[in-house]
């Protein structure tokens, strides 16, 4: 599965503020909104493993992720190839280090849905975009999000696992029945991050492709 497609499809969940939520309900949507609104920045290392429909491993990778809300995201893959995905909320850069090539394009054009509008910040909007259920345990909570817009988001469902109010695992099933599991470790929430981490200025010699 193409990791870029997964990440772009999910950007709206993490990048855009969910502040200002007021609800007397204690349903899955409200609980997820409250958890996501707890952080301004998020840093972690990740390990990814992807299985095909027959549960065969087809991809593994590891690296780090950095998020600053609203709108900024940096995903660095160290292995099997070095790749950096950066957005400041407006422009998306995908830099393939080994190829010395960077792709630049407006973020909204990467998917049929503008990530900025995916979650606009209210329980009502979450319910309009997704069917959300929760599977709680004594020390964790796992939310499943099924998009109402189906294939236009490149995935069938997402599962977000929170332990001690921190996002520790994300599982995605795509339209090809491929399942990717992202496990996060060394998590830092609301630690200072420089805004320069979310800007990309190609060095001389890097081939830039605009889309």
Swiss-Prot record:
Signal peptide annotation: 1-24
One GO BP: lipoprotein transport
Cysteine-cysteine disulfides: none
Record key words, sorted: Chaperone, Periplasm, Protein transport, Signal, Transport
Keyword Transport assigned: yes
A GO-annotated cellular component: outer membrane-bounded periplasmic space
Location in or out of the cell: Periplasm
Task of the protein: Participates in the translocation of lipoproteins from the inner membrane to the outer membrane. Only forms a complex with a lipoprotein if the residue after the N-terminal Cys is not an aspartate (The Asp acts as a targeting signal to indicate that the lipoprotein should stay in the inner membrane).
HAMAP family: LolA
Subunit structure: Monomer.
Listed name of the protein: Outer-membrane lipoprotein carrier protein
Encoding gene (name): lolA
């Amino acid at each position: 599965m193409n990791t870029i497609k997964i990440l772009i499809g999910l950007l709206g969940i993490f990048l855009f503020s969910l502040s200002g939520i007021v609800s007397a309900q204690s349903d899955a949507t409200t609980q997820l909104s409250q958890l996501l609104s707890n952080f301004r920045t998020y840093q972690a290392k990740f390990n990814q493993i992807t299985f095909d429909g027959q549960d065969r491993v087809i991809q593994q990778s590891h690296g780090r992720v950095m998020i600053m809300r609203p709108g900024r995201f940096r995903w660095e893959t160290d292995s099997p190839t070095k790749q950096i995905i950066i957005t400041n909320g407006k422009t998306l850069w995908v830099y393939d280090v080994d190829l010395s090539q960077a792709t630049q394009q407006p973020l909204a054009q990467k998917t049929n849905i503008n990530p900025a509008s995916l979650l606009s910040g209210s329980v009502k909007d979450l319910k309009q975009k997704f069917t959300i259920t929760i599977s709680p345990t004594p020390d964790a909570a796992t939310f499943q999000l099924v998009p109402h817009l189906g294939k236009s988001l490149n995935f069938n469902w997402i599962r977000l696992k929170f332990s001690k109010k921190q996002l520790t695992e994300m599982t995605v099933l795509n339209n090809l029945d491929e399942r990717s599991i992202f496990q996060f470790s060394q998590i830092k929430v609301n630690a200072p991050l420089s805004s320069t981490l979310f800007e990309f200025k190609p060095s001389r010699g890097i081939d830039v492709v605009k889309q």
